[in-house]
């Protein structure tokens, strides 16, 4: 049977990502932490660590080329996805992980400590109440809300020319039809996942 490490290495190759051995180890340790805490905290419906490699790690890392440093916010981070895998792979970028569920932010804070991630801040807050000291160059979300809500809830967090990235499964045609802003749909191919994945990208211009 394939190991988590083998699946991760193959997936990283397919995504064209080159990570150090310590970074790969951190990613696998993150899966172990989710597995350990999942019983008590109900962090994810995925129970199999091997499935987590594709559905959580590789799915998160598929958007890495589209993330604009240096300040990134992960809205509705849940179990720390996609924020923690990306933070492991982008150590020079600062990540702020936000969720309104205190159980989940407790887990994410613990994961940050155990994985020794110095570039991650965890906030227990509703998105609309967030007042960051510095605006973000990228705001991203995964399975958070419909596109209109995401846009309305996060625009105040974006710096001029900052980008909003919304991770979706099938292209949400109806949601996109209701938007009064320009957007780009980026198809994603995630190793180990047959289902469709896409990324919706929007940019905040100086007048928007």
Q: Where in this protein do the model-derived segments appear?
A:
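Class I SAM-dependent transferase core
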Residues: 1-69, 73, 103-106, 110-120
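Short loop/edge segments at beta-strand edges and connector loops
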Residues: 21, 123-125, 187
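Residue-level signal for inorganic ion chemistry
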Residues: 34, 86, 168, 202
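Conserved SAM/SAH cofactor-binding pocket of Class I
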Residues: 58-141, 151
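Active-site capping/gating segments
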Residues: 96, 170-208
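Short alpha-helix immediately C-terminal to the canonical SAM-binding loop
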Residues: 104-106, 147, 172
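A short glycine-rich, Lys/Arg-flanked "PGG" loop and its adjoining helix->strand segment in the class I
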Residues: 151-161
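Conserved beta-strand signature within the Rossmann-like core of class I S-adenosyl-L-methionine
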Residues: 161-171
